[in-house]
Amino acid sequence: MKLFGLIGEKLGHSLSPEIHNKVFKDNNIDGLYNLFSVKKDFENNIVESLKCLGVKGANVTIPYKEKVMDQLDIISHEAKVIGAVNTILIKDGKSYGYNTDYYGFGKMLERAKVNIEGNSFFVLGAGGAARSILKYLEDSKAKKIVLVSRDKEKAFKKFKDFNINFMSYGELEEINEEFALINTTPCGMYPNTNSVAVSEKVIKKFKVAVDIVYNPLETKFLKMAKDNGLKTVDGLFMLVGQGVKAEEIWNGIKVDKSTEEEIYEELKCRF
C-alpha cells in the first residue's frame, strides 16, 4: 500500500481525504491518505519524517508551505516563483516540491471556459493566495494583470518579481469596463459570509467574477456578480484541481475529467 497525506497544523476540517480516496478508487491505486498534524516544534523535520514513515507523497497546507522549501532537494519552477510548496513527492530517496494551486486555478478557469490570453484580470488581495494565481495569469499571457491592495507600496515590494500593475481599492472604484475580477481575500468566507471586498459599483464594471473561497459556494461577492449579469466561478474546483494534479505527480497518471467532476459534485453537497 502506498502512503500519502496532508501536512499542516489544524486539519480537522480538511476535505483532502475525500478527493484523494476517490482518485485511488477510480484508478485502482492501493493508497492510504492520512492527516499529519505537525506542531511548530517539529517544522524543521517534515521531509525527513515523511521519508522515515515511507510516505510517497504529501500535500502541505498552512503554516508550512514556505518553511518546507528549505528541506527539499528539488523545487519546480512555478513553486520557486510563487515562493510556496503545497505538494511533495518522495522518489528514490529524493524530495521534490511543487505548487499545484497554480494548476488548480488553471483547471478551474478552463472548466468555466474563461479565456486568459488577451484579457484583463484584476486580483483582489495581496496575501499568499494571490501568488499562484498571478503566476498562472502571467504564464497564460493575460493582456493586463492588476493587483488590488489596501497598501499599494507594500504590495509592490512583495510582488515586484511579477510583471503586473498595482492599484488601491480607491483607484479601483474609478476604472472603466474590464474583463475579470478575482477575489483572493478571505472576505465572504464562513462564518463572515456577509463581507465583500468591493462595492457593487466595481463589480458591475466586469464580465467575469471569480472567487477562490468555496465555503459558502456562492459568496456575497458572487451573488452580487450574478445579480448583475456577470459570469461567476466559485473556488471549489480549484481545490479539486490542485488535489488531482498532486495525484498525477505522485502516481504518474492522468486523472479522467469525469473523476474530477464527480469529486466536485460530491463536495458541492457540503456547502
From Swiss-Prot:
Its EC number is 1.1.1.25. GO terms for molecular function: NADP binding; shikimate 3-dehydrogenase (NADP+) activity. Pathway: Metabolic intermediate biosynthesis; chorismate biosynthesis; chorismate from D-erythrose 4-phosphate and phosphoenolpyruvate: step 4/7. GO terms for cellular component: cytosol. SUPFAM superfamilies: Aminoacid dehydrogenase-like, N-terminal domain (SSF53223), NAD(P)-binding Rossmann-fold domains (SSF51735). Involved in the biosynthesis of the chorismate, which leads to the biosynthesis of aromatic amino acids. Catalyzes the reversible NADPH linked reduction of 3-dehydroshikimate (DHSA) to yield shikimate (SA). PANTHER family: BIFUNCTIONAL 3-DEHYDROQUINATE DEHYDRATASE_SHIKIMATE DEHYDROGENASE, CHLOROPLASTIC (PTHR21089:SF1), SHIKIMATE DEHYDROGENASE (PTHR21089). Homodimer. This is Shikimate dehydrogenase (NADP(+)).
